[in-house]
Amino acid sequence: MRTLQEMTLQEKLGQRLAAGFQGLEPPKEFLRLIKEYKVGNIILFRRNIQDGPQLKKLCATLRKVVEEETGVTPFITIDQEGGVVTRLPESEVNIPGAMAVAATGNPRNAYDMGLLTAQELRSYGVDFNLAPVMDINCNPDNPVIGVRSYGDTPERVAEYGSQMVRGLLDGGVYCSLKHFPGHGDTAVDSHLGLPCIDRSFDELMQRELKPFIAGIEAGAPAVMTTHILFPQIEPEHIPATMSRRIMTGLLREKLGFGGIIISDCMEMDAIKKFYGTVNGVLAAMKAGVDLVFVSQTPALAVEAMQNARRAAENGELDLAELDVSVQRMLEAKAQCAAMQPKTLGDEAACRARAEEVRAASITAVHLPQGGMPALGDNPLFLGCADYRSTIASNGESSGFTFPEEMRRHADKGTALVTDKDPGDAEIAEVVSQAAAHSCIVLGTYNGHILQGQLRLAKALAATGLPMILVALRNPYDLRNMPNHVAALAGWEYTRPLFDALWPVLNGTARPTGKLPLLTLTKAAK
């Protein structure tokens, strides 16, 4: 691998950028990024992946091109958090998400899910997982974190997140704590707006920073930034990603972090809309971010590289700091390549372990006095199809629905797919149809945000029919339901979850999960 002393200015700058592309094969404009601008790192999404063999071939191709053009192996990165943020297709082994794992009550499960994920990714040639999420989901109205977090207390997030870090590293894959210094206590999605968390340093140390400190102590080699304003830390109205006070002053100097700092995508609206992606990339580099992501648009990555080159040549970007950052990247890549991975077992063992954890995550937030209602002879299964509730999720619908999958399992009753935000007319029609059924099984998907789902739930509950309500993403949908409604947290909208849920619905299995949310626990009592 090329040394720092052997690298040109353009090659150094290329080490500090990661870029993505559309489609299953890299287009010409993306290859131009590598060949002309020496971009040395890649991010993959579901849009780039058809199946395991195709992903393995793609990673090998990309690695070969980058090594030939830059003399340095690339980091090939991916967001494989588990649950609602998974980039591998359904045919591969996907783990439950963070909050589901925490609901099992066993931190060892977080370690095993990290080890399993690393084994899976490494087998395809992906060497850097952009996980775990170390945000504390202390705001129930948070539209982007939710079940991606391990819970709403710093202690739980620190414990489970640190175990995930250890599992990923033992499995031979680099990982990154995100989103520093915290994205949990906001009701704004930074993909779409510019959130603000108005806390002092001491307040952050008491809550938001605790999981990050624990993750760093567990050996996390990278930390991802967040595009959020922290006005008591950075008064210049710039988000953490672009703030030298936060990236260098707080993370490097006060917390003593010596690994690589990486950005969230600079095409998110918190940057693109308010500051501009190209300007934001340079500001992040100057703030102390080692690896900056332009994940969607190769043309923007070209502009960012051209702008960074001009800044390096005119003295705006400090060349000594550039060298320190690039050397840090080279050492990280050498360390990653030298990892000696452990394994959890063969594919069948990994799949079985993931399903064991998923089944253990299903949580009864409330059961009626008589226990789980019986489905009876003619159950009504209903709920909306999944939808992209945040840009962090995958870009396409799953192609299956909760009602239809449950009806298939039951082999009786009716499946009814509702709108994601049903209006009064649809609610009235659904309630009239429900009267003929023995039991109502309703699946919601962030109904606490799209309130029509909860209006439907309460209207159905008012019929007095036996009813089971299943939250298929954030469990806040389960608040304030009548006592006769059984309320279950399923955490995700996936076929493996539906398969694990069916024995609970038909009475042959008991939900054993424990709610990892103090706020919802209090509300449920």
PLM regions and their residue ranges:
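Short acidic/polar active-site loop segments enriched in Thr and Asp
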Residues: G40, D127, P221-A222, D290, ...
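Short, conserved phosphate-binding/catalytic loop or strand-edge motifs used
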Residues: M134-V144
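A charged helix-plus-loop insertion that forms the helical arch/lid used to bind
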Residues: E92-G105, S149-G151
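Second-shell residues forming the walls of enzyme active-site clefts
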Residues: T8, G20, P26, R47-T70, ...
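Alpha-helical scaffold segments that flank or form the walls of functional sites
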Residues: T104-V126, E208, E217, G280-K286
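Catalytic domains of carbohydrate-active enzymes, especially glycoside hydrolases
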Residues: R32-F45, L115-F128
